[in-house]
Structures are given as C-alpha cells and as structure tokens.
Amino acid sequence: MKEFDIEERVEKARRLFKEGGYNCCQAVVLAYNDLFGMDDATAAAIASGFGGGMGRMREVCGSVSGMTILAGFISPASDPKVKADRTANYALVQELAGEFRKKNGSIICKELLGLVPMGSSQSVPAESPEPSDRTAEYYKKRPCEELVGISARIVGEKILQLVNNL
C-alpha cells in the first residue's frame, strides 16, 4: 500500500463533502478509495445510498457507514466460509464505530443532528428522499463536515497502524 498523509486525507474528505457536494459516506470513502485500487466513480456509486443516515432515514451516520465500507477493504471477509475473516472484519467495524461513538456520543445520524436526544433511540419519520440544497445555511446548522473529518481520521489512523505493523 502506498504511503499517505492523514491530514491531507482528512481535509480531502471534508472538502469533498462541503465543496464537492458528496454525501458523508461518499466523502469518507473517496478520501481513501485509491489505496485499495478503486476508481472514484465506483467508490461514489457504492457509497451513494448511505448518505443522510441511509437514504436520509437518519439512522447510522453516513460517515460511519463510509468507515464500514473501507473496513471491507482493510480486513476483507470475501469468503463466507472463512469465519475468522468475518470475525476480524466485524471486530474492525466495531472498533471504528466505537471510536466514533466515544468521540461524538452516538453513531446515529438523528442524534448527531440533534433531531432527538442522544441515546433516546426515538423514531423519527423518514424525510423526503430529495437531498437538501447545499447552502451556507445548510452547512451552518449541520455538524456533518466535522463528523466526516472525524471518521476520515479514525479510519486513516487504523490504515496507518496496520501498514506500520506489516
């Protein structure tokens, strides 16, 4: 795997979200897809449905879903008969999500956006599937750019840790 600067990757993810118009999941995946030989169009397509907490349903934060997608490349479990690989993959996903939860209090989009109290697991009706317009007001009231940066840093640190242990 080629070397990379984690700060550049974090800033790239934030920029892709804020200036590029990509959703939170896409921004995290597109910050690292090249390390795994995946082209941008494929990466953006794979991650496209996870924005807004999965299709704007405000469930698992899209940036956490982005880390989960990348976990499949970091610790692949492509053969369902190899239980050890699945266990390692799930452990990595739990580690990444746990670190995000520790830093932010939740991995649930509606809680992170302040739509429901943290830890309440209250149901909120699904919003329109139409994405919000990316205006200055949109960015002012949403923590998403910051959360994208946090996820990009968490997964980047894990990639560097694994590369350094080779």
PLM regions and their residue ranges:
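C-terminal binding/interaction regions
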Residues: 90-166
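Contiguous domain-boundary segments centered on the initiation and propagation of an alpha-helix
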Residues: 14, 20, 39-43
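Polybasic, low-complexity association/targeting segments
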Residues: 1-19
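Phosphate-handling active-site elements
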Residues: 35-45, 73-92, 163
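Structural signal for hydrophobic packing residues in well-ordered secondary-structure cores
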Residues: 17, 21, 32, 36, ...
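Glycine/serine-rich anion-binding loops at beta->alpha junctions
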Residues: 22, 50-69
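Acidic-glycine-rich active-site phosphate/pyrophosphate-binding loop
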Residues: 2-4, 31-49, 122-128
